[in-house]
Amino acid sequence: PEKETGNDVLYTSELAIGYDHPLSVVSLDLKRGEKLGILGGNGLGKSTFLKTIVGKIPALSGEYRFGTNVQIGYFDQQMAMYTSNKTVLDDFWDEYPNLTETEARNALGAFLFSGDDVFKNVNMLSGGEKVRLALCKILKTRPNVLVLDEPTNHMDIVGKETLESMLKDYKGTL
């Protein structure tokens, strides 16, 4: 992360999440540097909770607030369905046009896009490759809080191991 958050990162109190009726009510106090995993079966509201705290859907009731200097990097599991007629390199450059080719290729290389992989058409990538591209773009913003909704769903073992290593080294809140 480029900038550190305050000690308090996320506070929720009786936060009711859902679409028509509450799926769950969540109270938590997440501090800087903590890593929180949300576990549970399908339909219990894990993704709904994450979408609520990043402002994609409204809370049904209760409150939530972020602390000082929080910069969120959000990965939605739907990013594995991303489409683009551009190459991996050009798609990445669209978001970071000031990078040199070497800088862009180095960033992509950290997510296993090496050599001619950067010239693949995004539409031809597997779900796992699209996830890696999305994570590369997100992490390039240097967020100090990562909100990841099932990032390993479409990844092969090498992709999962690479992500695991990066998350272990990540200095922000997760």
Model-derived features: where do they sit?
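ABC ATP-binding cassette signature C-motif
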Residues: 4-174
